[in-house]
């Protein structure tokens, strides 16, 4: 059976910014960035299915379906329409998204959904993969790295992606305090404070003997948006304080523009223990959390 006669499905994992250096605002209002990115496993991911149809449609289910929406502003539909336009295809698809990742949370959920849509539809419609690669930057800064799906160094406005396959896989716990953190205001606060004045690209990471050496090197880096995000959403600070107090944690930091934070752990058992502690704490019952291996996208 050809791909045109069957449905395809794939995971859209969380994107974790292990560090994020942000330059000053450019004339276009955007910023040059440098970030080391890894992806969660299927235990911390959305799931997308695409099947042949006459037109394009999207349905969304799952705990964060209402926040994501299924309208024209959903990046999955935007990606599908952009791919139709770029390729000239008249084919359609029925898209079904299970939304397990929190929205506007600093882990690139919408961008990962869009990248997965591009991958699935490229196969379903039997298109040249270069169409998806070319249009990805126009969908958002995180879409190119999500489309690559590999541990990568992300530079420029997100369009310069360098895979780093030699990085050791690590284990992490992801935690979101259940409070939205607005990306635009966080960047504006960063800019108003003179952030990015000394921005310069650093050398790519060296080879590491293991997770501890990797975490030690990451500890010399930073997330430039962490302080302005905490100023707007103090709960982020509470999450980081909690994570840093857990056994087996090598590094705790915010991802992206927040509010999701992560802790790299010596082993998966430590990450799972942290999720269990949260699950049994009534004061943290509204926190979203997941334990996962970080590496290439599933």
UniProtKB/Swiss-Prot annotation:
MF GO annotations: 4-(cytidine 5'-diphospho)-2-C-methyl-D-erythritol kinase activity; ATP binding
This protein's pathway: Isoprenoid biosynthesis; isopentenyl diphosphate biosynthesis via DXP pathway; isopentenyl diphosphate from 1-deoxy-D-xylulose 5-phosphate: step 3/6
Active-site residue list: 15, 142
Binding site for ATP: 102-112
Coiled-coil parts of chain: none
UniProtKB keywords: ATP-binding, Isoprene biosynthesis, Kinase, Nucleotide-binding, Transferase
Catalytic activity: 4-CDP-2-C-methyl-D-erythritol + ATP = 4-CDP-2-C-methyl-D-erythritol 2-phosphate + ADP + H(+)
SUPFAM superfamilies: GHMP Kinase, C-terminal domain, Ribosomal protein S5 domain 2-like
Function: Catalyzes the phosphorylation of the position 2 hydroxy group of 4-diphosphocytidyl-2C-methyl-D-erythritol.
Family, per entry: Belongs to the GHMP kinase family. IspE subfamily.
PANTHER family, per the entry: 4-DIPHOSPHOCYTIDYL-2-C-METHYL-D-ERYTHRITOL KINASE, CHLOROPLASTIC (PTHR43527:SF2)
Name recorded for this polypeptide: 4-diphosphocytidyl-2-C-methyl-D-erythritol kinase
Species name: Hyphomonas neptunium (strain ATCC 15444)
């Amino acid at each position: 059976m050809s791909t045109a006669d069957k449905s395809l499905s794939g995971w859209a994992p969380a994107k974790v910014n292990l560090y994020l250096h942000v330059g000053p605002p450019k004339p276009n209002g955007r910023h040059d960035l440098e970030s080391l990115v890894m992806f969660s496993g299927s235990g911390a991911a959305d799931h997308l299915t695409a099947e042949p149809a006459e037109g394009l449609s999207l349905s969304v289910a799952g705990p964060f379906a209402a926040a994501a929406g299924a309208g024209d502003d959903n990046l999955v539909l935007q990606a599908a329409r952009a791919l139709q336009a770029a390729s000239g295809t008249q084919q359609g698809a029925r898209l079904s998204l299970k939304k397990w990742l929190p929205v506007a949370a600093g882990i690139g959920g919408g961008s990962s959904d869009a990248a997965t849509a591009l991958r699935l539809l490229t196969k379903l419609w039997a298109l040249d993969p270069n169409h998806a690669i070319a249009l990805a930057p126009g969908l958002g800064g995180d879409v190119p790295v999500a489309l690559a799906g590999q541990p990568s160094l992300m530079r420029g406005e997100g369009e310069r992606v360098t895979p780093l396959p030699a990085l050791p896989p690590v284990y992490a716990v992801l935690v979101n305090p259940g409070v939205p953190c607005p990306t635009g205001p966080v960047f504006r606060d960063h800019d108003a404070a003179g952030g990015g004045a000394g921005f310069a690209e650093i050398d790519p990471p060296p080879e590491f003997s293991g997770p501890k050496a990797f975490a030690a090197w990451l500890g010399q880096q930073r997330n430039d948006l962490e302080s302005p995000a905490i100023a707007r959403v103090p709960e982020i600070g509470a999450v980081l304080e909690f994570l840093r107090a857990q056994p087996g944690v090598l590094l705790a930091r915010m991802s992206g523009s927040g509010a999701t934070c992560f802790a790299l752990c010596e082993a998966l058992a430590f990450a799972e223990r942290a999720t269990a502690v949260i699950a049994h704490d009534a004061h943290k019952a509204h926190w979203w959390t997941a334990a996962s291996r970080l590496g290439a996208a599933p």
